[in-house]
A protein has these predicted regions:
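Short amphipathic alpha-helical face segments that pack within enzyme cores
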Residues: 19-26, 117, 121, 240
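Short beta->alpha junction loops/turns
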Residues: 53, 111-112, 128, 234-235
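Short, well-ordered alpha-helices that flank and scaffold nucleotide-derived cofactor binding pockets
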Residues: 29, 33, 124, 243-247
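A short, polar/charged loop-to-alpha-helix boundary motif
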Residues: 113-130
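Mid-to-C-terminal Rossmann-like scaffold of FAD/NAD(P)H-dependent oxidoreductases
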Residues: 2-111, 148, 152-153, 157-178, ...
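Rhodanese-like catalytic fold shared by cysteine-dependent sulfurtransferases
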Residues: 133-186, 194-229, 233-271
């Protein structure tokens, strides 16, 4: 049976046992004369692949573009609980939103961490027409065994807000890869530690390692007239580096979404 997608209003084929059971109840209610209508679906799906949890809800980036939304995305790696908690596990979220209406259009998540909780929360938000401005104010359950103080889903929404509002000039890994493949002349500024760099890194002659703590002392090594893309492990230090460079007069500095943890291409390792 085809359903109507809640975000596009168009028919969609997404067979799920959960949807079939909802249809069964709705049919029974209508047989009894209750006049109930099924509003539609988001195509939410989750699956466990060995030790990895995978989930999605709403539109993918390509589906959102095909539906003519003004698409903006973010990639946010994190742990599912605070970094100091012994049960922490990594996960990666991708959020898709519409730049004009600021409505959340989709979420995808992967990792050994608790992915499904985030999928369910944001699927609920999308069902109710939530915007990325609504999500950070959701009053979710918090304690260190279950979540970070600001949950990764809310953090991802905040990153999208910063993108749309021009607070932080992000660029996606795919856009950076396209720049590199076209042979563009830019500086890829890695602000992680030398140990992190040896463990895994992007192998490219445009990459320059300057740990964040040394950036101000070595800032004269950087070309002021060249585009600079900052990166770190997950994005925070890259953001700090961008603000340092912008404050020092650099004009064209971007932050790579999600850092090395969200880089979907080959990495070099010295392990």
């Amino acid at each position: 049976m085809r359903n109507i997608h809640l975000l596009t209003g168009k028919p969609v084929f997404a067979p799920m046992g959960s949807t079939a059971n909802k249809h069964g109840r709705l049919i029974a209610n209508n047989i009894m004369g209750l006049g109930e209508k099924f509003k539609g679906i988001l195509g939410t799906a989750v699956v466990k692949v060995f030790d990895c949890n995978v989930g999605k809800s709403g539109l993918t980036e390509s589906q959102a573009r095909e539906a003519k939304f003004d698409v903006v995305t973010t990639l946010v790696p994190s742990s599912d609980v605070p970094h100091y908690y012994p049960t922490k596990k990594p996960l990666l979220l991708k959020l898709i939103a519409d730049r004009k209406t600021r409505k959340l259009l989709g979420i995808q998540g992967v990792g050994p961490g608790e992915v499904v909780k985030r999928i369910d929360v944001l699927a609920t938000g999308m069902s109710l027409g939530a915007t990325i401005d609504d999500l950070p104010s959701f009053d979710l359950g918090y304690a260190p065994p279950y979540s970070t103080a600001i949950d990764i889903a809310a953090h991802a929404a905040n990153v999208l807000r910063n993108k749309i509002d021009g607070i932080a000039p992000f660029i996606t890994p795919m856009e950076v890869k396209d720049m590199a493949d076209r042979g563009e002349d830019f500086l890829w500024l890695d602000v992680r530690s030398p140990e992190e760099y040896k463990e895994k890194r992007i192998e490219d002659p445009r990459v320059k390692l300057v740990p964040l703590g040394m950036l101000r002392r070595r800032i004269q090594e950087l070309p002021r007239g060249k585009k600079i893309v900052t990166l770190c492990k997950a994005g925070l230090r890259a953001y700090e580096a961008q603000t340092i460079l912008e404050g020092s007069g650099f004009k064209d500095v971007r932050i790579m979404d999600g850092g090395v943890e969200a880089w979907p291409y080959e990495l070099k390792s010295e392990k």
